[in-house]
């Protein structure tokens, strides 16, 4: 469901935003890919996915507060 919402928002943005703002288009393409990969994971893999993503973005070892048992 989340994937469909992101795709719909991306389509609206592609229509409204001119092509010279290519970074906005690229951002939504990356978001579609991330949401697609996230929805394919199970509960424990989702925890590790966000832990790895946040530590990669920040450059530090980030512990997510959600402990999925």
Curated annotation (Swiss-Prot):
Disulfide bonds: none annotated. The keyword Membrane applies. It comes from the Viruses. Residues 1-15 are cytoplasmic. Its main location: host cell. Signal peptide: none annotated. The keyword Metal-binding does not apply. It is a single-pass membrane protein. The chain crosses the membrane at residues 16-36. Residues 37-69 are extracellular. Keywords: Glycoprotein, Host membrane, Membrane, Transmembrane, Transmembrane helix. Glycans are attached at residue 51. GO terms for cellular component: host cell membrane; membrane. It is found in: Host membrane. Belongs to the asfivirus X69R family. This is Uncharacterized membrane protein X69R.
